[in-house]
Structures are given as C-alpha cells and as structure tokens.
Amino acid sequence: MANTWWELQILCEPDLEDSIFWRLEDFGCRGTASENKGNSSLVRAYLSTIQTQLLDLAALSLWLRQDALCVGVSSPSLQWQLIDEEDWATSWKQYWHPQEIGDRFLINPAWLPLPETTERLVIRLDPGVAFGTGNHATTQLCLESLEMRLSEVPQSFVGNSGKHKHLVIADIGCGSGILSIGALLLGAEKVYAVDNDPLAVQSTISNGLLNDISSERLLPALGSVDVLTKLLEKPVDGIVCNILAHVIIELIPEMSAIAKPETWAIFSGILLEQSKAVADALEQNGWVVATLWKRKEWCCLNVRRS
C-alpha cells in the first residue's frame, strides 16, 4: 500500500500565522504553505501517517489553541484529511508563490518560470521536506540581516567577481539551504552548511544546483558544529543559525570554538520571550548582541565577538 499523508488545514488570524509555522515545523511537518482567506490566513501542512496518529493531531490542535490563548487571539480551526503520496508531493506547491524579501531578494519556486525582468537576487527554491521557504518570519529576518551585514563589507574586500574576498560563513541547521544560497548570492566566497537531517542536506545540495552554485562554494554536510570543526581549515568570518532557541543555547560554546575575534553571527528561531536567555548565554561565551530585530513574536539577534 502506498504511503499516505495527513493534509492539515488551519484557519487562523494572521497574527498567529508565524507561531503556527513554528509549531508545525517543531511537530515534524513536511511542506507548509499559506494563503489569505478574507481577513484570515489558511495554513496547509503535511505529515506522514507513518509518524503521526490521530491522537497526535488532537494534541497538536490543543497546542495551537494554547498558542492562540498566549498571543491573545481567537483559537484556530484545524481540519485534516488523508491524501496519497503523489498528491502530497504536488498539492502544497500550488499555494506557494514568488516572494520578495528585504530590499534585494526574490524567492522563486523552482517549478515556476523566472521573472523576465528583476533587479533582485533570485533564489530558486524547491524545499521538498526541508524547512525554509521564506514564508516564516525568522527566515526573512535572517535574509535581511545577511543583506545588511554583507552590504557593509568595505569595497576593498570585494573582488572583481563581486565575491567578498575569502569571506567564509557557516550555516548551522541549513534546512533547504535558503540562507546559504542567499549569502553566496550576496557575494560570500564559501558557505559550510550543516544539518542533522539528511533530507535537509540533500535539499541544500539540490537547491545549490538549481541556483548554479558550484560545489566548491557551497559545502553541505550531515551533522552539527562538531562536524564543522573537522571540515574547517580556520575559523569562519560569519555564522547564520535559524533553529530553536534552546538548541542555540546548547551550541553556543561549540560555535565560539569556530569563531575568531572578528566573527559576526546571526541567530533566529527565537521567540521574543526567549531572547534574554539566548543573549545571556551569548554574553557568557564572549559574544555581544549588536542589534535585535523583531517581527511579530519572533526576533533575530545580530551579534559579534566581544
């Protein structure tokens, strides 16, 4: 019998959408998309029936109601149905459209034609089962932070090719590879991208090829910071990390080991209420928070070595 999937449809207030994306990603959903429905948002997500039972969906419904209560909005409506594998592979894609992020990026689904004219940096993306489509506030904040950070590099550090000379970045928890590709399109010379999920590593490789990025510039690997310590010849110039706050806190000492005095970092996946705990852990390990950007209940920390 072919594998089947749960298709979830969540009708919610727009203010709850980012929180729902985070909850779904943490729950293990494979592929998410959203669209406007009048004054509401309709979020679609997909879960394998091999990993998820009806009781799990009931628990998810309860957590979503609790999240709405914390935010102070009305409870979302959650419905689900079974669909075949073939339907899952294509159904969510019809709801995902090109999206401008920041001043320079355009996220373009790989199955749609490229725009005929645009001055933006186009990231072609097929996330598959990996996290990172550009829909989530944390991904947007990270791309905008990269845009700001790499635009600040002095022109003397930029070669004739447009690449920032010797600028090496680590992408920890790379997901679809969207942040790695964004950094490379902005001119970084090389990105080491790691993720504990082999499907995410494969997604990063595939999306790198979609964007004509050579394997010498984008180096994905299975694992975490411990793998980077073996791959890197020297400390990195920058770090991007868009994962859950408690994981960031656990990894900060290891990340400090791959940094040098001039290294900067961008951290997101952090709820506003978690920002102090992350900032405290950073300061205890020789980092200082330069700026905190927020979008709804999420934030992004731009930091540097102290």
From Swiss-Prot:
Protein name (database record): Ribosomal protein L11 methyltransferase
The answer to whether UniProt assigns keyword Magnesium to this entry is no
Highest taxon in the source lineage: Bacteria
Q: Which amino acid positions bind S-adenosyl-L-methionine, per UniProt? A: T139, G173, D195, N242
Provide the function of this protein: Methylates ribosomal protein L11.
Subcellular location(s) of the protein: Cytoplasm
Instruction: Name where it mostly resides.
Output: cytoplasm
Spans traversing the lipid bilayer: none
Any single GO BP term: methylation
Listed A to Z, the keywords are: Cytoplasm, Methyltransferase, S-adenosyl-L-methionine, Transferase
Q: What is its EC number?
A: 2.1.1.-
- Which species does the entry assign this protein to? Nostoc punctiforme (strain ATCC 29133 / PCC 73102)
Single GO molecular function: protein-lysine N-methyltransferase activity
